[in-house]
Amino acid sequence: RQMCIRDRGKMPEKSVYSLTEKGKQQFEKLMLEISCKPINIFLDFNAVIVNLDSMSRERQQECLDNIESSMEVLKKYLEENIALKKSKEDIPVTGMAVLRQQYTLAEAIEEWIASLKKEINS
C-alpha cells in the first residue's frame, strides 16, 4: 500500500492510498476466489422461524411481528440511503447496485413474512 497526501486548499489534507503491484495481484486473487465460492444466505431470524411451532400462537405472532418490524426499519433505511446516494456522482454504479440488491431482498423477505403470517393464522 502506498500513500500520498493531497493538498485540499482550506480543507484538511486528505490521505489517498493506492495498492502496490503485489497488493493489486493479491486483491485480484481474493476477488476471483470469493466470486467462485457458493453463495450463502444465512438469516439469523431463520432460527426463530424453524422453532415457531414450539411456541404459543401468541408468542409466534409476537416473534413474526418483531421480525416484520425489523425488516420495515431496514427497508426504510435502505430507501433513504438509496435516495441520498442516487444523485451523487461519486457513488460507483456497483455500490448503488448492492444497495438496490439489499432493498430487493428486504422487499422479498417482507412479502414472505406476510405470507407466513397468513399460513400460520389460517
Language-model features and meaning:
Residues Q61, E68, K75, I82, ...:
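Heptad-repeat amphipathic alpha-helical coiled-coil interaction surface used
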Residues M55-R59, S87, I91, A108:
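Alpha-helical structural elements of signaling/regulatory helical domains
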Residues E28-K76:
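Amphipathic alpha-helical dimerization/coiled-coil segments
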